[in-house]
Amino acid sequence: MIFDKGNVEDFDKELWDAIHAEEERQEHHIELIASENMVSKAVMAAQGSVLTNKYAEGYPGNRYYGGTECVDIVETLAIERAKKLFGAAFANVQAHSGSQANAAAYMALIEAGDTVLGMDLAAGGHLTHGSPVNFSGKTYHFVGYSVDADTEMLNYEAILEQAKAVQPKLIVAGASAYSRSIDFEKFRAIADHVGAYLMVDMAHIAGLVAAGVHPSPVPYAHIVTSTTHKTLRGPRGGLILTNDEALAKKINSAVFPGLQGGPLEHVIAAKAVAFKEALDPAFKDYAQAIIDNTAAMAAVFAQDDRFRLISGGTDNHVFLVDVTKVIANGKLAQILLDEVNITLNKNAIPFETLSPFKTSGIRIGCAAITSRGMGVKESQTIAHLIIKALVNHNQTVILEEVRQEVRQLTDAFPLYKK
């Protein structure tokens, strides 16, 4: 019987070897991709539970299948915890991803072809904020706003003038590569001025918002979307919040039956665990440590004139660095750092001159190393290791030194092998 084959290692060695290799990679690499984090064993246990067997189209108390009384409890727990965590009146926890959450929000707020003002991808926005290769750019008429050419920060007066000119039905705030705090109150004032809805995609900063170390968009936005991983440290999935009952009904209809069929109740259970973890007072200390670590790491680059720190600093979990004075492009920097077991990604910088497949910059985030227990001292050490590798990118002996120093650091802060 299939139920006898419960051990992946014995039943499917080829797959197990790949999983084990990834476990080893995570243990012995320094993870600096800003959209990644390390979940607790409790989150993984919930996601690997028998809930994966259950179909539950619909919502708690109103399902299309029988036998849903247990998953109703699970989903209700997730909903109520999300509402409490973010101070929202309504929450939808069924969206499979942040992109699905954004798609549902658009469906709830606007019609195909409507004009939307969103952050340009090159300035730090996300694909779902209007990229022409994404469903958002294909379905709606997106106009991109950028950052100030001198400060590389959002210029709210300029965004207001742009909004007056294009008269959008919706304004999208939020980013995937913007290192500064966003003033959601100003964005709402801009939206009100032109009669537009305001949607905030807080996927990257959700954990910081939950902990109260970053301003919350919930009091200002008509709809807030998020992922549940990244700084929130939960499973990969989406979340939608609102304080408007009428919009909540539209959101629910947009998610199901508009975009999805059966929800992933095992993932929703893992979301519920993550929300409970984030409600613990210790999570605020964790979120503050992310900000402290990121600031400390960024400061090392700011003090080295061979690198340029975009916008001059960071207020959150992420920052961008122009590396073109020491290496040809961000892609080569990413590849080189992978070789010394430091994982990050190439990233376009504002007013980018290189191809998006090469880029002038790299993006660095500190959520994952903070989850391992690393602090300011380790963050500074990692910055120096990155600089050492990039500056000496043709020196095999020095690169091996960096690799060994990375191993010493990861051994000192084990992930799951404690």
Swiss-Prot record:
Keyword Amino-acid biosynthesis attributed: yes
InterPro entries on file: PyrdxlP-dep_Trfase, PyrdxlP-dep_Trfase_major, PyrdxlP-dep_Trfase_small, Ser_HO-MeTrfase, Ser_HO-MeTrfase-like, Ser_HO-MeTrfase_PLP_BS, SHMT-like_dom
Residues found modified as N6-(pyridoxal phosphate)lysine: 230
GO cellular component assignments: cytosol
Lineage: Bacteria, Bacillati, Bacillota, Bacilli, Lactobacillales
GO annotation terms (biological process): glycine biosynthetic process from serine; tetrahydrofolate interconversion
Name used for this protein in its record: Serine hydroxymethyltransferase
EC number, UniProt record: 2.1.2.1
Cofactor dependency: pyridoxal 5'-phosphate
